[in-house]
């Protein structure tokens, strides 16, 4: 936790850090130096920033800090997925999940403590909404994960070349609706893309939204990254039930927003995420209806087997039904994947990011809810 009298430098993107250095009477190049020390060399204090003038280091000591997330627990799944539970104060916790694969390492980042959208199939929404995360709390998840993973592999901090980087992709798919925390999420994503910080390409940063149409347009104008849309239903009555935000931004408006976004997006398609719910949205008729509603949007489908939790009253679609549903889409020429469930033994699978505890304020119980905390090993 940082002192209330100091500024957390993790809250600044490049432009903000230049402005802050200017307020100290320093030139813009000092901001780049600071940014590299913080985001590439994992500096925890100012004494080791040897290319900064001693006078600047002394100024920073009295005015600024590099505040990092407080890790409450650190779990590794049997499949290599790693989940950090982060204490964000006042009994609230968020989760960050790293998914290792042969050709990439994907970090799933949270943007809010809880979520107000309250999708019926997502356990995070059932814990209610507490607050938005700050830019520091969002980018701090990437900083914490990248350097923890490097340490586990014996890799030293330093400029993020391809050979050194562990996190190659970031997905804003953790707890919360990112576009309802726009003012903090966008500076964090700017840092993810900045060559003086993490240097990821726009194609490797994906924001997932339940469909906040005005903010989709704003994101397209200001920082178009890869976009995923939590669709989950092929018609308005069903989506109203599963994704309550649909009552405000129905499918016709959402599809139009997707078309507008694609004019500026780094990828030439939208990824539509679709949680497979037995007897609810998983028939071949639903698949055909889905093709019709998305016909004017270049897209691919990511079918997500539902991860059950007691309060939902829902059941995962049977594997054979998921295959039949997918085949309808594939036969129509649409790229379709079925998400492999990862990290479900540590409650890190999609839709499980509330863990096993209903009350989001019971951090002590929740810390151990996913099972025994095991020794972190190399991935």
Swiss-Prot record:
- Protein localization: Cytoplasm
The protein's name? Dual-specificity RNA methyltransferase RlmN
| Cofactor note as given | Binds 1 [4Fe-4S] cluster. The cluster is coordinated with 3 cysteines and an exchangeable S-adenosyl-L-methionine.
- Which GO biological process entries does UniProt record here? rRNA base methylation; tRNA methylation
Enzyme nomenclature, EC number: 2.1.1.192
Catalytic site residues?
Answer: 95 (proton acceptor), 350 (s-methylcysteine intermediate)
- Other remarks in the entry: Reaction proceeds by a ping-pong mechanism involving intermediate methylation of a conserved cysteine residue.
Q: What does this protein do?
A: Specifically methylates position 2 of adenine 2503 in 23S rRNA and position 2 of adenine 37 in tRNAs. m2A2503 modification seems to play a crucial role in the proofreading step occurring at the peptidyl transferase center and thus would serve to optimize ribosomal fidelity.
What InterPro entries has UniProt attached to this entry? Aldolase_TIM, Methyltransferase_A, RlmN_N, RNA_MTrfase_RlmN, rRNA_lsu_MTrfase_RlmN/Cfr, rSAM
List residues of the Radical SAM core domain.
101-345
Q: Which Pfam families does this chain map to?
A: Radical_SAM, RlmN_N
Q: Where is this protein chiefly located? A: cytoplasm
Source species taxonomy:
Bacteria, Pseudomonadati, Pseudomonadota, Betaproteobacteria, Burkholderiales
List the GO terms this entry assigns under cellular component, sorted alphabetically.
cytoplasm
- Specify which residues bind [4Fe-4S] cluster according to the UniProt entry for this protein: 115, 119, 122
What the record says about family reads: Belongs to the radical SAM superfamily. RlmN family.
Which UniProt keyword terms apply here?
A: 4Fe-4S, Cytoplasm, Disulfide bond, Iron, Iron-sulfur, Metal-binding, Methyltransferase, rRNA processing, S-adenosyl-L-methionine, Transferase, tRNA processing
* CDD domains noted in UniProt: Radical_SAM
**GO MF assignments:** 4 iron, 4 sulfur cluster binding; metal ion binding; rRNA (adenine(2503)-C2-)-methyltransferase activity; rRNA binding; tRNA (adenine(37)-C2)-methyltransferase activity; tRNA binding
Q: Which cysteines are joined by disulfide bonds?
A: 108-350
Q: Superkingdom, according to UniProt?
A: Bacteria
Q: Where does S-adenosyl-L-methionine bind?
A: 176-177, 208, 230-232, 307
Which reactions are catalysed by this chain?
A: adenosine(2503) in 23S rRNA + 2 reduced [2Fe-2S]-[ferredoxin] + 2 S-adenosyl-L-methionine = 2-methyladenosine(2503) in 23S rRNA + 5'-deoxyadenosine + L-methionine + 2 oxidized [2Fe-2S]-[ferredoxin] + S-adenosyl-L-homocysteine; adenosine(37) in tRNA + 2 reduced [2Fe-2S]-[ferredoxin] + 2 S-adenosyl-L-methionine = 2-methyladenosine(37) in tRNA + 5'-deoxyadenosine + L-methionine + 2 oxidized [2Fe-2S]-[ferredoxin] + S-adenosyl-L-homocysteine
Cofactor(s) of this protein = [4Fe-4S] cluster
């Amino acid at each position: 936790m940082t002192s209330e009298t100091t500024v957390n430098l993790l809250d600044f993107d490049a432009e903000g850090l230049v402005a802050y250095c200017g307020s100290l009477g320093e030139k813009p190049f000092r901001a780049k130096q600071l940014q590299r020390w913080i985001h590439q060399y994992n500096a925890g204090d100012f004494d080791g920033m040897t290319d900064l003038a001693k006078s600047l280091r002394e100024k920073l000591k009295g005015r600024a800090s590099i505040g990092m997330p407080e890790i409450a627990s650190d779990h590794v799944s049997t499949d290599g997925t790693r989940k950090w539970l982060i204490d964000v104060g006042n009994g609230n916790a968020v989760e960050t999940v790293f998914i290792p694969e042969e050709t990439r390492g994907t970090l799933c980042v949270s943007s809010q403590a809880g979520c107000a959208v309250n999708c019926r199939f997502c356990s995070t929404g059932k814990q209610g909404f507490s607050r938005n995360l700050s830019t520091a709390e969002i980018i701090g998840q990437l900083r914490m994960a990248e350097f923890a993973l490097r340490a586990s592999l014996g890799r030293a901090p330093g400029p993020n070349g391809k050979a050194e980087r562990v996190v190659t992709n970031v997905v804003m798919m953790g707890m919360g609706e990112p576009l309802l925390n726009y003012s903090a999420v966008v500076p964090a994503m700017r840092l993810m893309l900045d060559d003086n910080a993490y240097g990821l390409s726009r194609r490797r940063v994906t924001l997932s939204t339940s469909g906040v149409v005005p903010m989709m347009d704003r994101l397209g104008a200001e920082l178009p990254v890869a976009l995923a849309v939590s669709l989950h239903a092929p018609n308005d009555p069903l989506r109203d039930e599963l994704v309550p935000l649909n009552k405000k931004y129905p499918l016709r408006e959402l599809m139009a927003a997707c078309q507008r976004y694609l004019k500026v997006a780094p990828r030439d398609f939208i990824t539509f995420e679709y949680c497979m719910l037995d007897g609810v949205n998983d028939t071949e008729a639903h698949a055909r209806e889905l093709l019709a509603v998305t016909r004017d949007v270049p897209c691919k489908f990511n079918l997500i087997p539902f991860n059950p939790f007691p309060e939902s009253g829902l059941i995962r679609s049977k594997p054979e039904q998921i295959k039949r549903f997918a085949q309808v889409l594939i036969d129509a020429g649409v790229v379709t994947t079925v998400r492999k469930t990862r990290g479900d033994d540590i409650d890190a699978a999609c839709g499980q990011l509330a863990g096993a505890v209903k009350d989001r304020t019971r951090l002590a119980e929740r810390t151990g809810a996913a099972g025994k905390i095991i020794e972190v090993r190399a991935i």
